Amino acid sequence: MRVLVLGYGMQGRAVVHDLVTDPNIASVVCADTEVDRAKSGLASLGSAKAEARAIDAADPTALADLLAGGFDVVVDTLPLRFVRPVAEAAIAAGVHAVNTNYDDAIRDLDGPARAAGVAILPEMGLDPGIDLLMGAEAVRRFDSITHLRSYGSGIPAPGDDNNPLRYRISWTWAGVLDSYTRPARVVHNGEVVEIPGDNVFDEEHGHTVEVDPFGLLEAAPNGDAAKYADRFGIADTAVEVGRYTLRYPGHAAMWRQLTALGFLGKEPIPELGGVTPRDFMVEHLGPRLQYDADQRDAVILRVEAEGIGGPAGGLTLDLVDFRDLESGLFAMNRTVGFAAGIAARMIVSDTIFGRGILSPIRDVPWQPFVTALERRGISIVESPAGPAEIP
């Protein structure tokens, strides 16, 4: 099996780290604009399977030429703007593709992908990704669903949350700030509730949950849960559906005030040379929120479900992972990158056999995927408890 990994950033590094240990993988080519960085990183792995190449993904010809190199599958860890160009190039080259971004930009490519016999699997990271598999499994356990909540988080491990924000960066800081002003939708009492981006941290939209070993965490709406009610096939029966971000206590109150003061605004300030408040926050806070080499991040996924004809009292699925200090891989890297790499193998081996634009909800088999995660030290724990009531 020959695998192409696009991007050697935080997630691409984890994909390559995982792939080179697999005896069924003949070679891994990692392509990045910063090829020297990729070469240095690959050299540290000490694997003859891994090779670095330079690529400008914004150049359609260069992308097409690279994908024509005889690969079985490409794992795309590039920024969101490259999702469609990579998918189109993969279809043209007859190469399967996996990415970790939302699928909105490529849904219309289902027909061309099917015609080419190509599987394109988006949303295959952590959130979205593993959370969607957990949600699909929870839904399968009931005849009909009345309540479904999904929680996702990347926060410092207990003890390493020792700065004023109780937060550090294991993803892109710009992406985190953008998510803090992204409109959300939830289903509450059977009705779709629209939440403007400036109000996602308002008290009326949040609640708290207890997660071991973190204690009480705040939950704020994250993205479009109503959309996923449709995709899970529960829109006609569910009275409560939500997707939430978890943070340590105090986070919501602080960001609620900063948002109200305009610190996440995207309008340039002429007196400051056209810098936007959001850009200032990215550049000023980013360097101050990094992890030290001996500090750990943590990833949390929780899915809570309740319904008819399933486990009495409801069902909760939990995933908690921490940074591996030996490899240096953050929990965020591990869960996003390993999930994408596992799915890439499953497509080539026909464990995932669909073609076209696929979905983790519909097309990724639960037990083989969970088993593969467990081999990497990542477990999903089931407990017999459903969602608590939200006022």
Task: Briefly describe each language-model feature range.
Residues 57-71:
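Conserved Rossmann-fold cofactor-binding substructure of NAD(P)-dependent oxidoreductases
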Residues 3-7:
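Conserved N-terminal Rossmann-fold NAD(P)-binding element of oxidoreductases
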Residues 33-37, 104:
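Helix N-cap at the beta1-alpha1 junction of Rossmann-like dinucleotide-binding domains, i.e.
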Residues 141-391:
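C-terminal catalytic/substrate-binding lobe primarily of soluble NAD(P)-dependent oxidoreductases
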Residues 61-62, 73-90, 103-106:
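Beta-loop-alpha module in the N-terminal Rossmann-like domain of NAD(P)-dependent dehydrogenases
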Residues 45-59:
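Rossmann-fold cofactor-recognition segment
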Residues 100-122:
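Rossmann-fold NAD(P)-binding glycine/threonine-rich loop
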Residues 11:
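Hydrophobic/small residue at the entry helix of a nucleotide-binding pocket
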